[in-house]
Amino acid sequence: MDFQNPGLVWGLYAAGLLVFGILYALSLKKAGLNLLCAPLSAVFGVILAVIGARFFFLVPNLIFDGGSLDADTLATLRPDEMSFTGGCVGFTFGVFIAAKICRTEAKPALDAMALPGCVLIAFARLAETGIGFINLGEMPAFLPAVWPFAILNGWGLPDFSVSTLMALAALLCALWLALSKKPSAPGYRFESTAFILCSVMLFLEMLCTTSSWIPFIISFIHLEQVLCAIILLILMIRRTIQIKKAGPLIVTALLLGLNALMQFVQDKPYLFPLPEDTDIALLSVIVFALTAAGLIAAWFWAGKTQSSSVKGS
């Protein structure tokens, strides 16, 4: 794999796994769970993360773009031909398998993994700045054109690293988890983390102007956004079944629809009767940010509804 700064990439990956292992072991110890889950999760997680990242990239491309599977295609590990969200799904399955091997309940193990997982995501996202050609956007004038905010492109000009924002979002989520002491049902901590990160990812993906990492499915929707939307719907459907109220799910579906509509407006503004002086880029940022905030609010609305139901019973 041809990286712009291979030392930075592999160094951050290694550091991320080391920090993950330490934090996960501490979380497992605090929860009274088997400490062996930590090293096993790292091993199985990395293996399944690579498989998941490749699988969730290949399958949609085969469906929408055609092509065939062969040995060379399967063995290709180009970073622009892998899905970060798919990698996260694969890593989660690795943690699940490790918990089963250690005869540990999966939900508490995943809850214990939530904070260390956020830190690992932050390291992995920051490592993308060393790859050099993925998750790039237009450089904002108010930010310094230096690493980790800027990456020099092939013409020696700075591009904005959206991966850095994604890393910061993961760290903020980790901070929230560290400060959150409120007890919750098994699995809720992990599911909340996944929902928040996918909601933020849905927003930040729209800042990417490069499509090498995320192929387009319907000319204006990124694959990563589709995967995040599917995860959001699955999590909210599970929550809706538990609380037996459809309100949060309806809000989630409407917000995802609004997100897709705004993507279409951004791609083909001439099809919509907007004022001539409308700043499409600014409008998109506002709508996508509000959509992400609305999705997170809907999730905690569902969680509050579940808590009220438990108290009432």
PLM features: residue spans?
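Hydrophobic, membrane-interfacing alpha helices
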Residues: 1-313
